[in-house]
């Protein structure tokens, strides 16, 4: 790629964007099994932050796969690419001072490590939404676990593909001990001090 040249040095700095918005641009990377509550928690927190005057963007795995990543399958390589693209998009938002909440199963440690490397360690917070496989199967609002059990979905995390739990996440939220609203409040209380220092 000798014909490509970065123009990042010509752009407005992240710190200037943050001053304008009066907030810190960070990424909350929500990881957990399908049906663990990632998207529900993200939406709650985004709405709560909006009422306080914070600019946020939720990047939901399903929505991303219906758009920019619709050409990707659920193979190991495509899952990695799904994470890579989402992380690159998140970085663009974060560099504009926007609080970005990514909701992806991202089942492997190396996938989440890649996301952190792209977004930047100081801007990346890994949030583990800890929900048992049993509870996720009981919820199964999309019917995906039933399909996976019948063999209709290949490489489905938790059934035919493993999930590697984060060993040292920035925050571990157990939905067994807390319902969705309580879990959302835990995340809200965690993120508020991180983004408020310019106010």
Identify the residue ranges that each predicted region occupies.
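Small-molecule kinase domains that catalyze NTP-dependent phosphoryl transfer to phosphate-bearing small molecules
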Residues: 130-186, 194-199
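Conserved lysine of the Walker
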Residues: 38
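ATP-dependent NMP and nucleoside kinases share a basic, alpha-helical "lid"
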Residues: 67-74, 78, 90-149, 155
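Residue-level preference for the first positions of well-ordered beta-strands
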Residues: 25-27, 55, 99-101
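Conserved substrate/cofactor phosphate-moiety recognition/catalytic segment
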Residues: 43-88
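Extreme N-terminal, non-catalytic leader segments
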Residues: 1-27
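Hydrophobic anchor at the beta1->P-loop junction of P-loop NTPases
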Residues: 30
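The conserved Walker
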Residues: 34
């Amino acid at each position: 790629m000798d014909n490509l040249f970065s123009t990042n040095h010509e752009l407005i700095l992240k710190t200037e964007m943050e001053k304008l918005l009066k907030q810190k641009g960070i990424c909350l990377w929500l990881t957990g099994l399908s049906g663990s509550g990632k998207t529900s928690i993200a939406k709650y927190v985004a709405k709560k932050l909006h009422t306080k005057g914070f600019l946020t963007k939720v990047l939901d795995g399903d929505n991303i796969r219906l758009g920019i990543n619709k050409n990707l399958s659920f193979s190991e390589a495509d899952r990695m690419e799904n994470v890579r693209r989402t992380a690159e998009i998140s970085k663009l938002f974060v560099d504009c001072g926007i609080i970005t909440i990514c909701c992806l199963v991202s089942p492997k440690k190396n996938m989440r490590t890649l996301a952190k490397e792209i977004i930047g360690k100081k801007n990346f917070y890994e949030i583990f939404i800890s929900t048992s496989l049993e509870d996720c199967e009981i919820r199964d609002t999309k019917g995906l676990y039933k399909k996976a059990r019948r063999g209709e979905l290949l490489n489905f995390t938790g059934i035919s593909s493993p999930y590697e739990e984060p060993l040292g996440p920035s925050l571990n939220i157990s939905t067994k001990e807390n319902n969705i609203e309580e879990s959302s409040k835990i995340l809200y209380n965690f993120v508020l001090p991180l983004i408020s220092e310019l106010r």
